[in-house]
Amino acid sequence: MSRELAEWLGHMGIRDRRVLDAIAELDRARFVPPHLVAEAYADRPLPIGFGQTISQPFVVAFMTEALGLDGGERVLEVGTGSGYQTALLARLAGEVWSVEIVPGLAARARALLLGDLGLANVHLREGDGALGWPEAAPFDRILVTAAAPQVPPPLRAQLAPGGRMVLPVGEAESEQVLRVLERAADGIEEIEDLLPVRFVPLTHLPPAV
C-alpha cells in the first residue's frame, strides 16, 4: 500500500525520486492510531491525539521535496508529531534533530523511531521547537510542521549559510502559506511562497515563573 501511495503522489506532481522511494519503503500505518490503520494510505491528514494530526501525504511529500535533500544534510525538524516525517527525513538526509512540545507525542515518537525502527541518525528532544536546537546549530535544512505568524527568529538564526527552511506561515484561523526561505552563502535571504496550506499552530512553552 505504501508503494501505491507513492505512485499516487507521483501522479499528483511529486518528482523527486528519492522522496517517492522513501515513502514507498515506509509504512505510514505504523504512525497512526490503531483504529485508523485502514485509512493510513488515504491522501488526507489523520488525528493522532493531543489535538494534533499526521499531515496529508501529499503535503508531507511536497514539503520534503521542497527541502532539496541530497543525502548529507543536517536537518532540524520542528514538530516531531507522529514521527512519520522524521523517519522520512532520516532516510533522505545525513542527520536529523527533531523537537516536539507535546510530552505524549514525544514519548511515543521516541519509542517508535529510536526503539522499534532503531534510527541511529535521529536525535529527539521534548521542548519548544520554536527555539530550535541551538547547541546543534547551524542546520543545512529546517522543516517546521506547524504554522507560525512569522518565521521564528531563533530558527532563522540557526539556518546555515547556503541553507533552506520550509515552513507554513500564517495565523491559526486564517490563510496560511507554505514558505521557503533560502540563505545564500553571503547571508542574503530569498523567500518564495509555494501554496496555501492548513496546519495546526506552532505552540510555545509557558514562560518560567
From Swiss-Prot:
Active site: S55
Domain of life: Bacteria
Keyword annotations: Cytoplasm, Methyltransferase, S-adenosyl-L-methionine, Transferase
Pfam families tied to this protein: PCMT
InterPro entries from the UniProt entry: PCMT, SAM-dependent_MTases_sf
PROSITE patterns: PCMT
Subcellular location: Cytoplasm
Catalytic activity: [protein]-L-isoaspartate + S-adenosyl-L-methionine = [protein]-L-isoaspartate alpha-methyl ester + S-adenosyl-L-homocysteine
EC identifiers of the protein: 2.1.1.77
GO MF term (any one): protein-L-isoaspartate (D-aspartate) O-methyltransferase activity
Gene3D superfamilies: Vaccinia Virus protein VP39
Enzyme class of the recorded protein, top EC level: transferase
One GO CC term on file: cytoplasm
UniProt GO BP: methylation; protein modification process; protein repair
Purpose of the protein: Catalyzes the methyl esterification of L-isoaspartyl residues in peptides and proteins that result from spontaneous decomposition of normal L-aspartyl and L-asparaginyl residues. It plays a role in the repair and/or degradation of damaged proteins.
NCBIfam families linked: pimt, PRK00312.1
Similarity annotation: Belongs to the methyltransferase superfamily. L-isoaspartyl/D-aspartyl protein methyltransferase family.
Name used for this protein in its record: Protein-L-isoaspartate O-methyltransferase
Species of origin: Anaeromyxobacter dehalogenans (strain 2CP-C)
Upper taxonomic lineage: Bacteria, Pseudomonadati, Myxococcota, Myxococcia, Myxococcales
